[in-house]
Regions:
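Short, Lys/Arg-enriched N-terminal segments with co-localized hydrophobic residues
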Residues: 34-53
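N-terminal interaction modules that seed assembly of large macromolecular complexes
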Residues: 54, 62, 67-116
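A structured, charge-rich N-terminal accessory region that forms the first stable segment of a protein
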Residues: 59, 132-153, 164-174
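Long, compositionally biased
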Residues: 101-137, 141
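Glycine-rich, aromatic-bearing surface loops/beta-hairpins
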Residues: 166-200
Length: 200
């Protein structure tokens, strides 16, 4: 994997996969995608429309809340849309304000409190146990959601952006960890979201 990683920073994702996909097993490509989406700089270069006027703290707060939504969904085995429906816009604005403090706590502790407070029941959408490959981390998927929120949110309205993305069909597509959706080009996901369907 080292020789792949060395070239990662010098190639855009499409060119990278074009060069190596014919010579790499799927598990390696998935790993490369996880490395790729952990680099905020690389992803931001891909994603047209990313809001560059926000402070790093504001972006970090969005990232934290996106990770938290993903964690709660996995823990309760729910669709991401079903989780976000429990939160009003004011609720999410509060979570964004608390993000700087809550990130010092474990996701487990914070999620337990929210699951109890908002009465989030267990579902049957178990994307982790159904995954036949290495499960992408909560933080990797959270970063992907963060970039989508930054790309589509109206007038720096982060709470509304989170609601819009997590209420969308795109979350079920990303949550299918047996597919290649979660490690495809982030701008492709943005365009698919705006189109209301996965583009061919």
């Amino acid at each position: 994997m080292i020789r792949y990683g060395i070239l990662l920073m010098g190639l855009c994702q499409e060119r990278f996969l074009e060069v190596f996909s014919g010579n790499m097993p799927n598990s390696d490509i998935r790993h490369i995608r996880l490395v790729f989406i952990r680099s905020t700089h690389c992803v931001a270069l891909h994603l047209k429309g990313v809001n560059l006027s926000m402070t790093e703290k504001q972006k970090d707060d969005i990232y934290y809340v996106c990770c938290l939504m993903e964690f709660i969904a996995r823990k309760t085995k729910n669709h991401r849309q079903d989780v976000v429906r429990h939160f009003t816009k004011k609720d999410l604005e509060r979570q964004l304000r608390l993000a700087e403090v809550n990130h010092c706590l474990s996701f487990e502790q914070v999620s337990d409190e929210l699951i109890e407070d908002y009465k989030i029941q267990d579902g049957m959408f178990d994307t982790v146990n159904e995954c036949r490959y290495e499960v992408p981390s909560v933080t990797s998927i959270g970063m992907l959601y963060q970039e989508l929120v930054l790309a589509i949110m109206p007038e720096e309205d982060a709470a509304q952006g989170i609601i819009d993305i997590f209420s969308s069909f795109i979350t079920d597509e990303i949550s299918d960890f047996n597919s290649n959706v979660y490690y495809t080009n982030p701008d492709y996901l943005r365009c698919s979201y705006l189109e209301g369907k996965m583009l061919a």
